[in-house]
Amino acid sequence: MQDIKIKSETGWKLDNTYADLPKTLFSKQNPTPVKAPKLVVLNQPLAESLGLKAEFLHDSDNVAIFAGNKIEEGSLPIAQAYAGHQFGYFNMLGDGRAILLGEQITPSGEKIDIQLKGSGRTPYSRGGDGRAALGPMLREYIISEAMQGLEIPTTRSLAVVTTGEPVIRENVLSGAILTRVASSHIRVATFQYAAKWGTIEELKALADYTIKRHFSDIDNLENPYIFLLQEVIKRQASLISKWQLVGFIHGVMNTDNMAISGETIDYGPCAFMDTYDLETVFSSIDREGRYSYGNQPPIAEWNLARFAETLLPLLHNNHEKSVEIAQNELSKFADLYHDNWLRGMISKLGIFNKESQDEALIENLLSIMYKYKADYTNTFSALTLDKYSDMELFKSKEFDKWHELWNARLNRQKESKESSNMLMKNSNPYVIPRNYRVEEALAAAEEGDYTVMNKLLHVLCNPYAYSDNQSEYEKLPQKSCGSYRTYCGT
């Protein structure tokens, strides 16, 4: 490991331990400088948590770092190699438009990845220009920070700079670079690459590094790789349940977009569900609904099976025994996910301890929500506030009957109604990043007006507040978002 130098006025303290891994797993690559970088968004609270002094980050030297025009002391820029399944088909991938600057060592001693997204071509660009447009980078900033507010594990967004250069997509767009922050950028697809093209020693080096980076409490285990598989399965079961509980649809659950850390990563074609429907899809490229809302849990399990396959040489010396171990661990995912989801759903209804009939109560509500095309978020907000709008659901006899059963269930528990209501407020967001609100913010920002985006971010950072200033953001769009489509921006 290199000697770490601190740039005292800003707090940068960079290292790159990933670059100590076998050279097959990455390529050294500097960002491509841009013409006229301008800082347009800075996440000051995140900067401070990383040990950076936000007041200095607006100066030209630091804007140059965010743009890739300057390499900070301690940084060793690399593009990471990975290969995985995109819509079920295996491809050679890798960071085609992203550069890992290194790991910022925080005041608490954590190592946090600092990556530039849209920073130019790399050996993995596969014909792409390596650049990003302003809209998609701001979109990732908004949604990732909304997920942080929702208390869902996620990569974060530190800054967005415009480049002063155009990006050619269907139209000519403003170029931009996002500074993404993550526990790491190690993916299922990273392991797939190592298993496909690396040696067993290189695969083992990656696994050992991952364990040290994310599961450092493992000590003296006979086989730490079984524990690695178990922990990744547990984290993904928890993560996907949290997505489902708030109606988040990732949109592109390829294996390169499943982080070993258990954080949500890559916010290209994601969106939040309005009307409750398991078949909801927003991504323009997901024509078959592979990554629909209802398919997210089984797709996560499928991705984890691909991860388990990569670990087979490490799980046991005997291949058949390795397969048996992997299958046994994978078989636990469905129950782990369901337990997390059910625990979250009863909390959304103000129920503290599970009873056998609770699942039927939940499924009954969801079925009538689907029948009456009810808004997912606002239905639970109405239950929380005990204020029922003119939503068709609330006028139905089915809802009246369900409401009686729910009240009877609440009356059977020993906790007070006040405690139950507080549990609901902590479990049901009052606001989510409504698709039309995000589009409004992006449209204004592309015209140079960031006030709409900043107001939206302020509300989204505390979605459980149930405050008056949030009320306008819980409103539904005037027109249905059923035809709303999202794009990955590449």
Swiss-Prot record:
GO MF terms here are:
AMPylase activity; ATP binding; magnesium ion binding
Q: Could you tell me what this protein does?
A: Nucleotidyltransferase involved in the post-translational modification of proteins. It can catalyze the addition of adenosine monophosphate (AMP) or uridine monophosphate (UMP) to a protein, resulting in modifications known as AMPylation and UMPylation.
What's the protein here called? Protein nucleotidyltransferase YdiU
- Gene name as annotated: ydiU
Q: Which reaction does it catalyse?
A: L-seryl-[protein] + ATP = 3-O-(5'-adenylyl)-L-seryl-[protein] + diphosphate; L-threonyl-[protein] + ATP = 3-O-(5'-adenylyl)-L-threonyl-[protein] + diphosphate; L-tyrosyl-[protein] + ATP = O-(5'-adenylyl)-L-tyrosyl-[protein] + diphosphate; L-histidyl-[protein] + UTP = N(tele)-(5'-uridylyl)-L-histidyl-[protein] + diphosphate
Q: Which residues bind Mg(2+)?
A: 257, 266
- EC identifiers of the protein: 2.7.7.-, 2.7.7.108
Cofactor(s) for this UniProt protein: Mg(2+); Mn(2+)
Give the UniProt keywords, A-Z. Answer: ATP-binding, Magnesium, Manganese, Metal-binding, Nucleotide-binding, Nucleotidyltransferase, Transferase
Q: What is the lineage of its organism?
A: Bacteria, Bacillati, Bacillota, Clostridia, Eubacteriales
Please indicate which superkingdom the organism of origin belongs to. Answer: Bacteria
Q: NCBIfam families from the entry?
A: PRK00029.1
